[in-house]
């Protein structure tokens, strides 16, 4: 992430009781699914801003440090076990990957960052690309930032949140791998993060790309960003395959 991120300051609205409810209520008996996510298809990989699709419609981007479960999150969202490749090699995502949903709707997979073994030249190329994307992309509605709840909020996360918010981009944090902690411990960790001055007003929720915890709430948020005012709920059934992707940790 470009060094200029460090110079940005930001302030987002204070969390509401509804924000807390989103993280608490992960056993909704009537699951919500934003249907276009099930129709996701890979479109292209981008290494230069000029290669991005036309800047129209609406898109949501997903970012995160290497190894936090970003690809597994995309696969869980789309109910496609191999849509985003899950790799045993951190930092595998080396470009912006574009997935088409319904016409005019896109899901954007941003490069994983913060892994020390990624070549320096590659890291330097990511910074300007991410900076241009976040600063100039008018169709970008929100940034979903995936964190490992066991090791959340590092310096790179702080840089990205500050820069995105400084560009006027809503940021929503997924505290992934919440299933690795007890419910009480996960809630305590989220409360600790909410108390951090630099995270005041940053929306966040508990999530698990393995169990689907928090999935309904995330579908509702994405529906609101990509199709405001439209009813896109579809029923789910026990036959839907939400098994985790095979393989190791992902970028």
Pin down the residues of each PLM region.
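Positively charged N-terminal leader segments that act as targeting/secretion signals
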Residues: 2, 231-243
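Short, positively charged and aromatic/hydrophobic N-terminal segments
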Residues: 9, 16-20
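Conserved G1/Walker A P-loop phosphate-binding module
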Residues: 20, 25-115, 242
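Canonical P-loop GTPase G-domain recognition
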Residues: 37-47, 180-233
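Conserved nucleotide-binding/hydrolysis micro-motifs of P-loop NTPases
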Residues: 47, 92, 105, 112-114, ...
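Switch II of P-loop NTPase G domains
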Residues: 52, 92-97, 111-141, 149-163
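Conserved C-terminal guanine-recognition region of P-loop GTPase G domains, centered on the G4
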Residues: 131-202
């Amino acid at each position: 992430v470009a060094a200029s991120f460090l110079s940005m300051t930001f302030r987002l609205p204070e969390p509401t009781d509804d924000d807390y409810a989103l993280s608490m209520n992960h056993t909704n008996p009537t699951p919500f699914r934003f249907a276009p996510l099930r129709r996701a298809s890979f479109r292209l990989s981008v290494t230069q801003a000029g290669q991005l699709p036309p800047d129209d419609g609406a898109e949501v981007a997903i970012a995160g440090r290497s190894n936090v479960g970003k690809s597994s999150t995309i696969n869980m969202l789309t109910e496609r076990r191999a849509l985003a490749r899950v790799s045993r090699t951190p930092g595998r995502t080396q470009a912006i990957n574009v997935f088409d949903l319904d016409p005019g709707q896109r899901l954007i997979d941003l490069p994983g960052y913060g892994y020390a073994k990624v070549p320096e030249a590659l890291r330097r190329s990511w910074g300007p690309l991410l900076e241009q994307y976040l600063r100039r992309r008018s169709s970008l509605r929100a940034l979903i930032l995936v964190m490992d709840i066991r090791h959340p909020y590092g310096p790179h996360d702080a840089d990205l949140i500050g820069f995105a918010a400084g560009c006027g981009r809503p940021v929503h944090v997924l505290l992934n791998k919440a299933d690795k902690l007890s419910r009480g411990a996960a809630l305590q960790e989220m409360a600790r993060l909410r108390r951090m001055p630099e995270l005041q007003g940053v929306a966040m929720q508990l999530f698990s790309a393995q169990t689907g915890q928090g999935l309904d709430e995330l579908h509702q948020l994405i529906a609101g960003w990509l199709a405001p005012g439209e009813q896109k709920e579809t029923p789910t059934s026990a036959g839907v395959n939400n098994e985790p992707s095979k393989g190791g940790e992902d970028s």
